[in-house]
Amino acid sequence: MAPAKWLIASLAFASTGLAFTPEDFISAPRRGEAIPDPKGQFAVFPVSKYNFDTKDRPSGWNLLNLKTGDISVLTTDADVSEITWLGEGTNLLYVNGTDSVKGGVGIWISDAKNFGNAYKAGSIPGAFQGFKLAKSGDKINFVGYGQSTTKGDLYNEAAIEKPVSSARIYDSLFVRHWDAYVGTQFNAVFSGALTKNGNKYSFDGKLKNLVQPVKYAESPYPPFGGSGDYDLSPDGKTVAFMSKAPELPKANLTTSYIFTVPHDGSKVAEPINKRNGPRTPHGIEGASSSPVFSPDSKRIAYLQMATKNYESDRRVIHIAEVGSNKPAQRIASNWDRSPESIKWSSDGRTLYVTAEEHATGKLFTLPSDARDNHMPSAVKHDGSVSAFSFVGSSKSVLITGNSLWSNALYQIATPGRPNRKLFYANEHDPQLKGLGPNDIEPLWVDGARTKIHSWIVKPTGFDKNKVYPLAFLIHGGPQGSWGDNWSTRWNPRVWADQGYVVIAPNPTGSTGFGQKLTDDITNDWGGAPYKDLFKIWEHVRDNLKYVDTDNGIAAGASFGGFMINWIQGQELGRKFKALVSHDGTFVGSSKIGTDELFFIEHDFNGTFFEARQNYDRWDCSKPEYVAKWSTPQLVVHSDYDFRLSVAEGVGLFNVLQEKGVPSRLLNFPDESHWVTKPENSLVWHQQVLGWINKFSGINKSNPKAIKLSDCKVEVIDHEAGSYFDY
């Protein structure tokens, strides 16, 4: 380790103890979407909880009473990977990952009131998920997805012979995407049917691949696609799915289409919004998402962006008639928000949509025939919405949400009425005890061009008459935000309860504050966002007397990691005692190694070879910037990060070490852009929090705060000093 003066200021900081620890954070129960039964009496949701003693994560399913809010255990069988309502009373279909077919799954039918009394309806010969069901005569038609072979069969990894060579050969992009190299198999939506014999349903094992007949199509689209990428019409006859435009280069453009196809696959799927097609509004050629059929199965609502290479363009609601050549209608197209999901009311007259607004994921309603200037109405609820479903045939919805202060909020919301709380995790889980909205507040500051929002997150037991070091956290994206939602990776409450006041800014480039703020970061990564951050820091220094900026730290991931590297070479870098850069770009020209070229080609106004000056403009590795480096910096980068190569982190660490800047590299060979495995997450928190606590003085003021020595992973240290010491 290079010798250096690691100075710690000895200040009388407020000591918070450790109300919310990384262990609490990682081991707290994690609950999924609550899905109500057809009559709106009960909802089923998954739950899991990591155990540090046994090193496993037991999982199961619970039943939520929508009248009382009471929760009961439905099953603790970890092999049950998915449950959905059959559409008949309290009958359920569930998927069991252990099956007689090696590598396959079993389809089981049960009743929520007597779950143990289940029967097997059939087997599917491969991994399969995302069931959607609809009655069609005496059958229940279904769709779901798995991976497809090039021939169109459901891919079963257990049945594939291992090739004698490990070579990969590519003639087009992608080569790798997010955390994996692209192979010959691809995602596809398959259809099938359950047939009723007496009182029981059975599945004959026959699946129809609805995607493979369209050459180069894929749905759901990786890495984050899921069941929201397709839908089954209520009459069970038609399927809609989203795929990237098959005829266009996928790594360079975001253009995608909504396809429709008969459930039985009797015709090849066709796009309803092909660019320059007769049904597509003029100039609309961006990414499509969230197809959903109307209750009468005659219309499809979907979202689409305009720009063909911009993943953060504004989404606009479109409605197309099934089987018609009429152009799709744009709904509330002047609304300066970007919807994320849609559902129809039972009468088809109202759309319920989610959209981010001012750092909160909100639920809105609007008429399904709304004109361009219509402004949707917000529905009252707590926290941010992650999913919602209608309660029976009413206008009320069951919201699955979360917030900065709770990882699960189940509530009933009805337009024009107060929300009704069912279950809030922070009021039940001992790991979340003491968390609440009182420690969170918004902050608005004049930025480089407009007012900029931040969150102030205070530690448990906060005392305004005491002083707390600043933790300045910069989000990724850059087109993203610090929202009022729970993060399972970078969670401001964990940082705050080390003894900090967290400031989480939403500078230029952030989403949810109007499309202009999002767009304004284009080709300006180190410009307006940096100025915004500096102005926020100055405001905190001058106005928040309970925040000690002299002993503050700054940290960020992805774009936030880039910004930390940029700050290190700028004036703001001298304002912090320590920095943490997680998966941030370092060398401007290295961006060409990313997977999604459309991202950099949009954000830097051209290709790597045609607009090279734009890539070099915000190059953190320029000698004039590196010459200013002096703030201790922790670098985090993992091997499976194919969005930003691990070489970026290693190169950054190389320069920090050669310059003699106190520094450390944290690397995970089995993680990607995100660190998600529980034991790795614990080490991440021990190293990141231990690093900032060492330099901020927290370790002296709060004996219970995390120290670097708390991590039991051995440090690799082979040298006595810096290159420049000799």
Swiss-Prot record:
It comes from Arthroderma otae (strain ATCC MYA-4605 / CBS 113480) (Microsporum canis). This is Dipeptidyl-peptidase 5. GO terms for biological process: proteolysis. It is found in: Secreted. Its main location: secreted. Residues 1-19 form the signal peptide. Extracellular dipeptidyl-peptidase which removes N-terminal dipeptides sequentially from polypeptides having unsubstituted N-termini. Contributes to pathogenicity. The active site is at 558 (charge relay system), 641 (charge relay system), 673 (charge relay system). One of its GO terms (molecular function) is serine-type endopeptidase activity. Its EC number is 3.4.14.-. InterPro entries: 6-blade_b-propeller_TolB-like, AB_hydrolase_fold, PD40, Peptidase_S9_cat. Disulfide bonds: none annotated. Residues 268-292 are annotated as: Disordered. It is an enzyme of class 3 (hydrolase).
